[in-house]
Amino acid sequence: HLVPEKLERRYSKAQIRKSSRFVTEIVTLGSSLTCYLNNLGIENVYTSFHYVDNNYYTPSANLYNRGGDVKVIVMGALARDFEQIAYIVSRLPQIHFYICKGRENIDYLFSGLKNATLVGYVPEAELKHYMNDSDISLNVMKDTIGSNVICTSMATGLAMVVSDVGSIRDYCDETNACFCSSPDDFIKNIMILANDRELLNSLKKMSLKKAQQFSIDNYCVSLSSLLK
């Protein structure tokens, strides 16, 4: 479920084509990777999706009436644009951001930004706590195939503000997400949601609904149909 750029760093297109001949089927987690492989002349490709454990990733009890200011969480490192994220944070001093950086060395980008809390590599339960204390999942991406971050964000009922790249529309649509193509788009959409709680709650509700499509049970059904 690597983006094409990551695949091409490791393998030549000739190697990818050759390897595809030794398997019955290649399973991808997003249509953009399927299209990439099809364009290489590889036809034995099945498009599935990234699953989520809806029993563990659940919304907070006060999802629709969280007190205080709107909070935004940023998670994931693969094909993320942290410089652009830092710019967005700097332009929205009234919004608090949880920046889940994992092991990425990006602290210098957020130096002096008092509205950013940098979160290192933490246990899953602690990460879920930050998700449940947030309203919006911000995903500034250069590309994406299938994303654990996207699916868990939706399962915890977060409104999605995302780059319109890769396979993102396999997972989100206009009912639960704001699609962006520039830093100003991200800033504008976060401000719209921060100032319109009714719209924010509508996106949250639809994220929860859409997350059910990506449950482990549905993933098993998807794969079992492939094996028949």
Would you name each region that the model predicts?
Residues 142, 158, 162-169, 182:
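Short glycine-rich donor-binding/catalytic loop of glycosyltransferases
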Residues 5-26:
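Membrane-proximal helix-turn-helix segments that form the acceptor-binding/catalytic region
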Residues 132-145, 158:
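Acidic donor-binding loop of glycosyltransferase active sites
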Residues 32, 51:
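Carbohydrate-associated surface elements
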Residues 38, 52-69, 83, 108, ...:
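Acidic anion/phosphate-binding donor-loop and adjacent secondary structure
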Residues 192, 199-213, 222-225:
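A short, well-ordered alpha-helix in the C-terminal region of glycosyltransferases
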Residues 65-108, 118:
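Conserved catalytic-core segment of nucleotide-activated headgroup transferases in glycan assembly
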Residues 174-184, 192-198:
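Conserved acidic donor-binding segment of nucleotide-sugar-dependent glycosyltransferases
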